[in-house]
Amino acid sequence: NYLISVENELKEKKAIVDEQNRLYDKIDNLIKPEMDKVKGILKSISPEDKDFDKEMRLACLYIAYIKRRSNLAMIMENKLDISSNELVYAIKESLDYLSFYGIRSSFTYEGETSLDNKVGGLIFEFYQDCIIRSLSSIHSCLVKLECKPNKVVIKVILDEKITYFDLNYKKKEIEESNGIMKISIKVFLPPQVQFNTS
């Protein structure tokens, strides 16, 4: 009986470790592009470089995303739904670092609801993709988030066009996430260029 008890205990511990490793691998895959960017920045600069300050601020911007995206993934792992406030906190912190980087930023949000966890992650990834794709050209960024039961709208308003943005952005993921929530993601790009997925 003692041996069986020890064996069962070891199996339980192994299952916990396996689950933790699975989660870490999942998060690793989610944030790998940003981690690679940070590693690249840190390898390529030294304190004597004239762009050292700017590059370190850029690294901080990526690190803020890594922190918040990882946090969202951890919360989502344990819950089918998350509070839209988690998304608000994530975008707020990221925009603080965008301002620190030198781009004027503003964030307005309205309402509070429960989000299907896939929708929450998708919206934050979309926001991040907009910022990263436009980082070299924009001077200001306004993000508006509207949360209502069964509807979440994010608008990213930039002062320059994004060089390239797929109009079918993560269409498959958006369709798969639409079981519980209806989401509409929009980007307004002057002059009146619009990306809209409903």
Sequence positions of predicted segments:
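Short, non-transmembrane amphipathic alpha-helical segments
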Residues: 126-132, 164-175
